[in-house]
Amino acid sequence: MKLADVEERMQKSVEATQHDFNSIRTGRANAALLDRVMVDYYGTETPLRSLANVSTPDATTILIQPYDRSTLASIEKAIQLSDLGLTPNNDGSSVRLNIPPLTTERRKELVKTAAKIAEGGKVAIRNIRRDAIDHIKKAGKAGELTEDEVKDLQEKVQKLTDKYIGKIDALLAEKEKDIMTV
């Protein structure tokens, strides 16, 4: 196992955590809120983004314009069933989502959700570290690496772990600030 592979896997964990953060509502309209919404399209669960153009005409509105108008009702239903807590307004050709301002209580809940997402990302990075260190130890026992090389590689893996956990902490701090800003 190469350090570059370990670093790439850790970077992907950070990117996945960032993607999960983007799905948290912050009080401003953000098309990424709808990334996880799946629409029943002729019996198949299909991502909303592949059925419609999603835009944010202003800071409090998301506009969904389906490529096929027959999907309007399905899109509306999928949004209602999602955990976003938003009410869709169907005007016959598009669906509008008005983003209400968040209450202080809801903001605190969202900060807790963000912390859980961050912890999930950190756990993924720690698992990558554990796998890498196990691999290094096996190589050391097999005689492929000297004791000094094993120790050196373990230190490098730990430094990578610290670096990427720091990145997740920074993303979390940024998201918390974003959520708590009125």
Curated annotation (Swiss-Prot):
Organism domain of life: Bacteria
Subcellular location: Cytoplasm
Matches recorded under InterPro entries: Ribosome_recyc_fac, Ribosome_recyc_fac_dom, RRF_sf
One example of a Gene Ontology biological process annotation: translational termination
GO CC annotations, alphabetized: cytoplasm
Classification via Pfam families: RRF
Gene Ontology molecular function: any one: ribosomal large subunit binding
HAMAP family: RRF (MF_00040)
Family per record: Belongs to the RRF family.
Name of the protein in its database record: Ribosome-recycling factor
Natural source organism: Thermosynechococcus vestitus (strain NIES-2133 / IAM M-273 / BP-1)
Protein encoded by which gene: frr
